[in-house]
């Protein structure tokens, strides 16, 4: 019950923080665009991690009710943590920091795509932007996420390398299931100034997925 209450309180705080900035977006954006986008993105990534923690806690409690100590997964025995009643605040802060740090990179990338790729046929320009985004930014973005989390969690080089080797390609494949369609819509219908916000709103689901993968009991990190 404590984990549920903690996560609900955390979600409410992040939601209020997010909508506070949304309500003042235009004024804040004109004064400090990158900081405004960064704080919005930080609140969204924090929400994503809280969602992931809630799902993770629910799964562990569900399995613990069926089996007291361990569960069988992919042919291996995985020991469950002694308790799931504690909200990992430091983990949520790490994800908020990740969102804040990613924003200026993401924003400048979208601006560069818009400025560099200009053709007489708008559809071709959009397709080229999506292609560059998915074949350049997406692979590097996943590397940035793994490195950021590994460094902020003080993981050793060997464990980080092992995690890369095990999880990079599956994560990149999962990226290609979701993001090409999202970015096609984003670059077609969303104004440039709002493209980062739209991508980050959709990214709540993606970041929750990454958070679950990064914190899974059998992760080599």
Curated annotation (Swiss-Prot):
It is found in: Membrane. It comes from the Eukaryota. Its main location: membrane. Keywords: Membrane, Transmembrane, Transmembrane helix. One of its GO terms (cellular component) is cytoplasm. InterPro entries: Mpv17_PMP22. It is a multi-pass membrane protein. The chain crosses the membrane at residues 2-22, 34-54, 97-117, 131-151, 177-197. Pfam families: Mpv17_PMP22. PANTHER family: PEROXISOMAL MEMBRANE PROTEIN 2, PXMP2 MPV17 (PTHR11266), VACUOLAR MEMBRANE PROTEIN YOR292C (PTHR11266:SF50). Belongs to the peroxisomal membrane protein PXMP2/4 family. This is Uncharacterized protein C4G9.14. The lineage of its organism: Eukaryota, Fungi, Dikarya, Ascomycota, Taphrinomycotina.
